[in-house]
Amino acid sequence: MRPTSSRQNPSVRRLIATAVTTAAVATVLLAGTGAGTARAVPAGNPGPYARLSPIAELSARRLATADLVAAAKWGTGGPVDDPVRERQVLDEVAREAGEPAATVRIFRDQIEANKDVQRALHRRWDVRPSEAPSVRPDLAEVRAEINRVNHALVRAIARTAQDRGAPCCGGVLLASAVQAGGELRLDAPHMTALHRSLGSVCRP
């Protein structure tokens, strides 16, 4: 069955609720940062976990939107890849970032991880049509939520210039990702994608 445009399906409502929660978290993280380019700030009193964990949390919440994006694209005949949209995202974060090159590398991983989940879901729905979504979320609305998370993630990255080069970065991100994935009840494919999304956060 191909999906129809509707918001009455309970599973889609749950996914939209996750996106709304994502927007709320993004709003909190953005509060007080002001507009314009995100600049790296010196490490304050909080430890590396407190500074790095928002990157893992926001990455997990961004990844959770892949289910909605996959549902929106399902049955349209179009590909998962959207080079125009991807370039728009990368150009926007480059303009906002204090470290454009590093931030763009991180967001490339974010985009590829999101597409990994979309493809996995489409393969599952091809094999198990009964699990496929019966309604199609509004992709523009979903992307608006993703954009809010993107803004917060750019700022979270900017706050961690020193921590991303520290020896503890990888371990802290791993622990943060496990916690964030558990809170969102991400399954194995989502967790694999989450780890991919964080692959360029720590500097060599």
Regions found by a protein language model. Name each.
Residues 44-81:
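Immediate post-signal-peptide N-terminus of mature secreted/exported proteins
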Residues 126-160:
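Extended amphipathic alpha-helical interaction segments
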Residues 2-3, 14, 163-204:
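Glycine-rich, aromatic-bearing surface loops/beta-hairpins
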Residues 71-98:
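N-terminal, post-signal-peptide region of Sec/Tat-exported proteins
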Residues 72-77, 121-124, 128, 160, ...:
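Secondary-structure edge/capping motif, primarily at the C-terminal ends of alpha-helices
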Residues 57, 61-64, 85-92, 105-116, ...:
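Charged, amphipathic alpha-helical oligomerization/scaffolding segments
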Residues 1-41:
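Secretory targeting and sorting signals
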